[in-house]
Amino acid sequence: MLDPKILRQNLEHVVEKLRRRGFEMDSDTFLQLENKRKEAQLAIQSFQTKRNQLSKTIGMAKSKGENPEPLMAEVSQLNDELKQEEANFETIQKAFSDFQLAIPNLPHDSVPDGKSENDNREIRQWGAPPGFDFTPKDHTVLGERDNQLDFEAAAKLSGARFVVLRGSLARAHRALAQFMLDLHTDQHGYEEVYVPYLVHEECLYGTGQLPKFREEQFQVAGDRNFFLVPTGEVPLVNLARDEIIEAPALPKKWVAQTPCFRSEAGSYGKDVRGMIRQHQFQKVELVQLVQPENSYQALEEITRQAEKVLQLLALPYRVVELCAGDLGFAAAKTYDLEVWLPSQNKYREISSCSNCEDFQARRIQARWRNPKTGKPELLHTLNGSGLAVGRTLVAVMENYQQADGHIRVPDALKSYMGGVDYF
């Protein structure tokens, strides 16, 4: 959520920055709501002033032995009018809050202009795509051996965009997640956290998935207002809800492996085969909570930490800076990591690392205590995939495939795979 002070004091600047990301803010509606809010606030103050004055007059009348009942009747009527105006004010505040919740974050000044992923800017590449003396196969074909990648069984259980993994592929999937967690906890200083996979609606409001992306969420039917997590970012960031963290305890660095559940609304016809776009997938998520002045340094750090996974697995990739029009709703700046897939002869997204500045923190009131002032201030929140496990498995299968269809085990994974060289 944007700072209301910025909206009120520098509306034209906000409108212009939002326009960079293709969002047209209805400034007329904002001004109307703001005027109504001010009018209601003034009306409440006026009623309160009149009531206080009448209360004093009643006291004086009683001290003089005069009949206070006419004045008390007037106070009673004022109280009724005050309650009505307070209810009106709450209605206006709710409309104002709903209006704010629909506004995305402002892009950082360093974010390049652009309308879509076609305008994203490549920052760097690492590694060279492998050369094959045979035509490389798609991961779905490679997984057909011994039926280890079974989409038919998954469809029988759950429908399209699910997969059943068996045997060595299931083990490789588990090994990748364990490798990522060990790297981030042992070398990158993250605290591992096990979190619920069902969260309250307010958690999704807190991180920005709601209200705009409701159709992309899986909501649990029943009396309890639960949603399946679309990303580990949601429960991890919400751990700081309504907290005030002392400065020496910062930064907070949390990592979790969670399943992610997405309806993929709007993705009809995209990546219908294989494991690239699924309703359920595993992801290792990195989250940092930092002091505002350190957040862009933290963004570079979290991106490098996600890159380290790909480097240790020797998977070719590139880093792309997202243009303003391709930014996620809550992000002020984002880097995507894209891994090379030989069967597609192109790079595909495998991680997204974002600085949300104080956008999420304002929604969940995640704060730190500034030792200089002694007062609580909003934190900056960052998140990054470190990495999406299924897509990493796809990349390993395709980049390490052999002519006979077997997959060579990356050196970094051998200890997690029982020391075997191929699977």
UniProtKB/Swiss-Prot annotation:
ATP binds at R262, S263, E264, E349, I350, S351, S352. It is an enzyme of class 6 (ligase). Pathway: Aminoacyl-tRNA biosynthesis; selenocysteinyl-tRNA(Sec) biosynthesis; L-seryl-tRNA(Sec) from L-serine and tRNA(Sec): step 1/1. GO terms for biological process: selenocysteine biosynthetic process; seryl-tRNA aminoacylation. It catalyses: tRNA(Ser) + L-serine + ATP = L-seryl-tRNA(Ser) + AMP + diphosphate + H(+); tRNA(Sec) + L-serine + ATP = L-seryl-tRNA(Sec) + AMP + diphosphate + H(+). GO terms for molecular function: ATP binding; serine-tRNA ligase activity. SUPFAM superfamilies: Class II aaRS and biotin synthetases, tRNA-binding arm. Disulfide bonds: none annotated. Its EC number is 6.1.1.11. Belongs to the class-II aminoacyl-tRNA synthetase family. Type-1 seryl-tRNA synthetase subfamily. Catalyzes the attachment of serine to tRNA(Ser). Is also able to aminoacylate tRNA(Sec) with serine, to form the misacylated tRNA L-seryl-tRNA(Sec), which will be further converted into selenocysteinyl-tRNA(Sec). Homodimer. The tRNA molecule binds across the dimer. This is Serine--tRNA ligase. It comes from Coxiella burnetii (strain CbuG_Q212).
